[in-house]
C-alpha cells in the first residue's frame, strides 16, 4: 500500500509540478498517513494523523524531520489516545508517547502546553525549534471521541455532534498555515 501511494504521489507531483504535499488521514487512514511519513519523510511537507494512534509497540518515527500533527479525542474507545486499550481489546500507543518520541528524535528545544475552548475543550502541545524547523503538534479534544472534527452527526460511522451552526468568524484565518504556505 505504501509503495503504491508513493508512486501515485510521484507521478502526480511530476505531472502537475506540485511542490508541497501534505498527507492527512483519519482512524486507519491516520495510521496510514503516519506510516507514509515514516517511510517517505522527504516526500511530504507535513502529516496529520486524526484519531489514528498506532498499535502499541508499532509506532514509527521518520528518519528525517517532518511537520506532524496528531489529533485525538479523549473519549475515543475505538482508538484511544490516552487509556490505550480499545473497546474491542486492541492496544494503542498513547498519543503523548508519539508526541514525545517525535519531539525528542527531531531535537525540539521548546515545548508549550495550551488549554483552550473552541466549542470543545482542547489541550494543545507544540514542540518547536526542531531540526529543519519542523513543528510537532499534539491536539487532544477532551470532549469528543472517535470523530472527524465538525462532521454532521448523520454522516457515516465517524460522526460527532452537529456543528453546522458553528461560528467560524471567531477564527483568525490567513493565507499561511503554521508551516509557511
Language-model-detected regions and their locations in the chain:
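Residue-level signal for short, function-critical loop segments
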Residues: 8, 27, 53, 74, ...
Amino acid at each position: 500500500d505504501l509503495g503504491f501511494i508513493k508512486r501515485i504521489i510521484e507521478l502526480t507531483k511530476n505531472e502537475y509540478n506540485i511542490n508541497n504535499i501534505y498527507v492527512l488521514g483519519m482512524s486507519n487512514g491516520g495510521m496510514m498517513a503516519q506510516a507514509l511519513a515514516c517511510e517517505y519523510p522527504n516526500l511530504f511537507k507535513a502529516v496529520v494523523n486524526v484519531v489514528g494512534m498506532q498499535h502499541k509497540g508499532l509506532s514509527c518515527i521518520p528518519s528525517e524531520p517532518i511537520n506532524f500533527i496528531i489529533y485525538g479525542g479523549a473519549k475515543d474507545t475505538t482508538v484511544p489516545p490516552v487509556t490505550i486499550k480499545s473497546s474491542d481489546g486492541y492496544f494503542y500507543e498513547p498519543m503523548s508517547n508519539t508526541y514525545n518520541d517525535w519531539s525528542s528524535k527531531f531535537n525540539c528545544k521548546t515545548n508549550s502546553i495550551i488549554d483552550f475552548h473552541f466549542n470543545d475543550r482542547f489541550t494543545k502541545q507544540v514542540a518547536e525549534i526542531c531540526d529543519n524547523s519542523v513543528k510537532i503538534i499534539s491536539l487532544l479534544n477532551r470532549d469528543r471521541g472517535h470523530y472527524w472534527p465538525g462532521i454532521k452527526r448523520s454522516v457515516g460511522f465517524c460522526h460527532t455532534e452537529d456543528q453546522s451552526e458553528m461560528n467560524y468568524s471567531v477564527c483568525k484565518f490567513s493565507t499561511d498555515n503554521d508551516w509557511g504556505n
